[in-house]
């Protein structure tokens, strides 16, 4: 046996995980909720984390966000939402259509950010009672609904899809009337 044995093969260096951003003073209950969310999202094919600590799923044409947060009373909430459209002219017809659609949904609802002409589809869960299977079903419902209606909203009311640049803005269709 030689005095200077060959070195053992080097083990692969562990993948370095970048620290994920977290809101300042995030309670331990939200940290625990994040562990459940991250575990479930990892089984769904991956995710990104934005600068605010929100989880982002870039599936299809509507980005979906999963946002764990807390209320002043200590309760935790998981907000799951997709921003479907931007730069949509806000009209009475649009708001009526959104409200009528909301009556059809079992889970979730459309919301309108008037200032940005943004349409969201969202559903919230009570974090302290949320189970991984419930989170998965909620994410699936939000993604499916957002992708089902985003093109229709663009065609009927103008604006653009969330994933399109400003060059994708479609003017609203001409209103029938006098001329």
Give the predicted meaning of each segment.
Residues 1-65:
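Charge-rich, low-complexity N-terminal segments
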Residues 27, 31, 88-92, 129-136:
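Ordered, soluble secondary-structure elements with a strong preference for glycine-centered loop motifs
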Residues 47-53, 70-74, 112-116:
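Short, ordered beta-strand-loop transition motifs
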Residues 65-87:
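A short acidic-to-branched-hydrophobic micro-motif
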Residues 79-122:
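Short, internal acidic amphipathic alpha-helical interface segments
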Residues 114-145:
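A short, solvent-exposed beta-edge/loop patch
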Residues 137-159:
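A conserved amphipathic terminal alpha-helix motif
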Residues 153-179:
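Short, highly charged C-terminal tails/helix-capping segments
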